[in-house]
Amino acid sequence: MLAAAQEGSEVAFSRLWRDGNPALLRYLRVIAPEAAEDVAADTWLQVVRGLAGFRGTEQGWRAWLFTTARRRAIDEARRRSRRPEKALEETLPSRLPVSPDTADLALEHVDTRSALSLVASLPAHQAEVILLRVVAGLDNETVARLLGRSPGAVRVAAHRGLRRLAGILAEADVTL
């Protein structure tokens, strides 16, 4: 599939997008909540531009996708810190579109939203490690390279983050 997308197959690229975008958005909603969709769009634009030159495996491609997203999120955070925020009323449309299945979709994703919310409450480095390991499905060594840390530091951050999540859930007597 990756090779076909690199050769210009729209069907193959569409499949890469369908397979990768949900996890990418879940990751970005935690590390860049105010701009997740914008950062995802920038990420995919960068992927389109660089896909033909990418050399590696499917797992390497996932790592490249999330590395690109992380860099775009950092760029967006810098950009936002330099410009004043618009008033909320200016950014919202006057009427939000409603889909007949919106309620069903909301119910379907309630557990995912709760879990992501809990992960977002962790220290940033622990949350990012957990998201890259669990949501993105990357291995320890890949996450370590992506974040510029040692595999041991990644394991420790994941362990501490998961232990903290377990404590939060035990205190609240919550099941996801």
State what each model feature region is:
Residues 1-4, 114-123:
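Short amphipathic alpha-helical boundary/capping segments
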Residues 6-15, 25-42, 55, 176:
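Short, charged helix-capping/linker segments at alpha-helix termini
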Residues 23, 114-117, 127-128:
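Pre-recognition alpha-helix immediately N-terminal to the DNA-recognition helix
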Residues 83-112, 139:
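Internal acidic/polar
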Residues 16-34, 50, 119, 171:
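Amphipathic, Lys/Arg- and hydrophobic-enriched alpha-helical face
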Residues 38-45, 59-71:
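Structural recognition of an alpha-helix C-terminal capping motif at a helix-to-coil junction
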Residues 70, 74, 126, 135, ...:
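DNA-recognition helix of helix-turn-helix
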Residues 30, 49-56, 66-88, 108:
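Arg/Lys-rich amphipathic alpha helix in sigma70-family domain 2
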